């Protein structure tokens, strides 16, 4: 069941004295029509809602419910510092149920604890700057991405064997979790699961 909306907050719900704050979708600094319609996250709104939860004596703990690929860097450092300082007042848990990447992981790292679903994705620690260059000498418009040197895997080149292999590592790891859980649920050995599932294909019910 959903919780009750916390008074004087934009996004916070409350269940059993625990404030749940969503960090969902792309992260931007300021709230606007796009963030309202698309369900993106504004660090400005998030910071205000976090403070409201901290100041409410009925709130015993805070959960940051994260499913975000990250977003704009502006405002993230201030928000993360606020979350880190909040740990001295109340327990702050970051739960990553889907994706907690880039700026979203920066936010999660400031919490007292990070809890992740086994199929969640986290990381992508690094910075990317994108620029579009246009003009006659460029034969039209070209987009460039500059990645911080500490994060060469943040934007892998799928046109290269190395890039495809790096993405394959993540896909294989997710596939291993999938197989392990199906094996547990059905009470069979993991090595039998791929064949049962036609090695990624589909079976009709009569043949399953």
Describe each PLM feature range.
Residues 95-101, 196-199:
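Glycine-rich beta-to-alpha transition loops that act as phosphate-gripper elements at the mouths
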């Amino acid at each position: 069941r959903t919780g009750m909306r916390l008074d004087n907050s934009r996004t916070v719900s409350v269940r059993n004295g625990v404030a749940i704050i969503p960090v969902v979708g792309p992260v931007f600094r300021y709230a606007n029509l796009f963030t309202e319609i698309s369900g993106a996250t504004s660090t400005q709104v998030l910071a205000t809602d976090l403070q409201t939860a901290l100041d409410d004596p009925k709130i015993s703990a805070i959960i940051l419910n994260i499913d975000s690929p990250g977003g704009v860097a502006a405002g993230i450092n201030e928000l993360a510092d606020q979350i880190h300082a909040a740990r001295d007042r109340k327990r702050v848990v970051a739960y990553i149920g889907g994706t907690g990447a880039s700026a979203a992981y920066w936010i999660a790292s400031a919490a007292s604890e990070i809890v992740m679903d086994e199929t969640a994705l986290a990381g992508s620690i690094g910075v990317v700057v994108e620029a579009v260059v246009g003009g006659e000498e460029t034969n039209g418009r070209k987009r460039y991405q500059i990645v911080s040197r500490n994060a060469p895997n943040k934007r892998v080149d799928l046109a290269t064997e190395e890039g495809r292999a790096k993405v394959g590592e993540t896909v294989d790891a997710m596939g291993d979790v999938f197989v392990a859980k199906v094996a547990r649920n059905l009470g069979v050995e993991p090595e039998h699961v791929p064949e049962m599932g036609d090695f990624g294909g589909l079976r009709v019910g009569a043949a399953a």
